[in-house]
């Protein structure tokens, strides 16, 4: 094997250790003129009834070295468990020319020596996984200066007691039921919110309608996720539900960030329109969320086998961090403005109650972002592969709690201290906004 660059070793460690388990377990892809010494296809949690099927066709190996006929046994597919990953990396670091196909820590599937002779050059075989574990499917090219082209079809599944195939990993087979349950929770939440708005029509503002829309989109996103995982579970492919899932996920994320920003600015119930700097936050966040969702689709629908997969992960992470920071600014501006206003307008008690509410909202938003971005990732990393569903459940529970708290704090109610703004306050705020003197 050619000397493996350190970056490839890091990529192998990062991708196999932290790659989220694949969700569409029948995949077809094309590799064209690829010279990478190792390609990670996907990750899957197997039970003792697990199977993996790999089909390749239209295989060609082009050598740019003096040897036009590379040794076929030095190119092949294998499975690698997470426990064995560090051992393989240690072998590679000790001997950069070491071929991973020679390691006794990997589960060999086949090499190019098993292919049918040209011009067909194809292979199709199913393998039982007798040792339950979470495995990563790799292709290794241990021949220096060679480029490989091939069409690859992979199929991974576990068998249920009744003999049917379950294409979801061992730790994700509960997801259809989980998402269906939270869909019902949000439908009930939407019904209760609609009733609350109806019974308090006099204090309903445009932001409350956006909040209702957020609940509706979140519900649709969850039912699409449930159907997506259900069809993947029984057939191996999402049957188009993944398209609807990504559409509603995009709308939900953009709407959630928009609602948080607008609540933080006090739009519609504290002032009738936004200042220029608040509009700029929306102008920045919404396009970034478009980019983040494009990255999410590329990450979810392809895999680490594409050359730019790590780059897309980095783009998604960077954009998400920027958006999370951006939505904090309007809340901070509002807190600062209320603190300054309370010193001069003679309404210290009223401003103090609003200031307290904004501080509480700030803490709630920070807690939500911290848990969903850091704690959930930690759960996915440390949880055993059979219990990956726990991290998804934790994320949905925290999201639901966040929605309930946020909606309760800013509900349409006569006695809600945040909305109880008398006429002279509204006129003063509108005048200050027109003069661009009301810093928020």
From Swiss-Prot:
The keyword Glycoprotein applies. GO terms for cellular component: membrane. It is found in: Membrane. The chain crosses the membrane at residues 175-195, 207-227, 243-263, 281-301, 315-335, 363-383, 390-410. Keywords: Developmental protein, G-protein coupled receptor, Glycoprotein, Membrane, Receptor, Signal, Transducer, Transmembrane, Transmembrane helix. Induction: Induced by the N-acyl-homoserine lactones (AHLs) N-3-oxo-hexanoyl-homoserine lactone (3OC6-HSL) and N-3-oxo-octanoyl-homoserine lactone (3OC8-HSL). GO terms for molecular function: G protein-coupled receptor activity. Residues 1-24 form the signal peptide. One of its GO terms (biological process) is G protein-coupled receptor signaling pathway. It holds the Pfam family GOST_TM. Disruption phenotype: Abolished Gram-negative bacteria-mediated promotion of root elongation triggered by the N-acyl-homoserine lactones (AHLs) N-3-oxo-hexanoyl-homoserine lactone (3OC6-HSL) and N-3-oxo-octanoyl-homoserine lactone (3OC8-HSL). Its main location: membrane. Belongs to the LU7TM family. Plays a role in plants and microbes interactions. G-protein coupled receptor involved in root growth mediated by the bacterial quorum-sensing signals N-acyl-homoserine lactones (AHLs). This is Protein CANDIDATE G-PROTEIN COUPLED RECEPTOR 7. It comes from Arabidopsis thaliana (Mouse-ear cress). The lineage of its organism: Eukaryota, Viridiplantae, Streptophyta, Embryophyta, Tracheophyta. The gene is CAND7.
């Amino acid at each position: 094997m050619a000397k493996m660059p350190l970056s490839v070793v890091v990529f192998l460690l990062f991708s196999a250790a932290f790659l989220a388990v694949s969700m569409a377990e029948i995949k077809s892809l094309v590799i064209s003129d690829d010279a990478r010494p190792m390609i990670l296809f996907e990750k899957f949690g197997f039970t003792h009834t697990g199977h993996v099927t790999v089909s390749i066709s239209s295989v060609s190996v082009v050598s740019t070295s003096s040897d036009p006929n590379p040794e076929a046994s030095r190119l092949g597919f294998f499975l690698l468990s997470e426990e064995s990953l560090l051992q393989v990396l240690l072998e590679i670091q000790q001997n950069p020319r070491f071929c991973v196909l020679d390691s006794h820590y990997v589960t060999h599937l086949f090499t190019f020596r098993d292919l049918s002779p040209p011009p067909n050059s194809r292979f199709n075989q199913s393998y039982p996984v007798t040792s339950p574990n979470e495995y990563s499917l790799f292709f290794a090219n241990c021949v220096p200066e060679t480029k490989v082209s091939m069409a690859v079809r992979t199929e991974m599944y576990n068998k249920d007691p009744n003999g049917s195939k379950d294409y979801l990993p061992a730790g994700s087979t509960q997801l259809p039921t989980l998402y269906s349950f939270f869909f019902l929770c949000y439908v009930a939440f939407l019904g209760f919110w609609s009733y609350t708005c109806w019974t308090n029509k006099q204090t309903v503002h445009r932001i409350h309608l956006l909040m209702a829309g957020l609940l509706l989109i979140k519900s649709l996103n969850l039912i699409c996720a449930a159907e997506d995982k259900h069809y993947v579970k029984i057939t191996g492919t999402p049957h188009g539900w993944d398209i609807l899932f990504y559409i509603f996920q995009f709308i939900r994320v953009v709407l959630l960030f928009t609602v948080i920003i607008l609540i933080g600015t006090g739009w519609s119930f504290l002032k009738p329109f936004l200042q220029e700097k608040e509009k700029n936050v929306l102008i920045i966040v919404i396009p970034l969320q478009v980019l983040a969702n494009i990255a999410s689709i590329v990450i979810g629908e392809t895999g680490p086998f594409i050359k730019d997969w790590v780059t897309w992960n980095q783009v998604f992470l960077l954009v998400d961090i920027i958006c999370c920071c951006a939505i904090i600014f309007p809340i901070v501006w509002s807190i600062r403005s209320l603190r300054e206003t309370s010193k001069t307008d003679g309404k210290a008690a009223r401003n103090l109650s609003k200031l307290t509410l904004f501080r509480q909202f700030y803490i709630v938003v920070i807690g939500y972002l911290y848990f969903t971005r850091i704690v959930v990732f930690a759960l996915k990393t440390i949880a055993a592969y059979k219990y990956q569903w726990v991290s998804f459940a934790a994320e949905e529970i925290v999201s639901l709690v966040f929605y309930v708290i946020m909606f309760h704090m800013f509900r349409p109610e006569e006695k809600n201290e945040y909305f109880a703004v008398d006429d002279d306050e509204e006129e003063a705020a509108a005048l200050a906004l027109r003069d661009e003197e009301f810093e928020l």
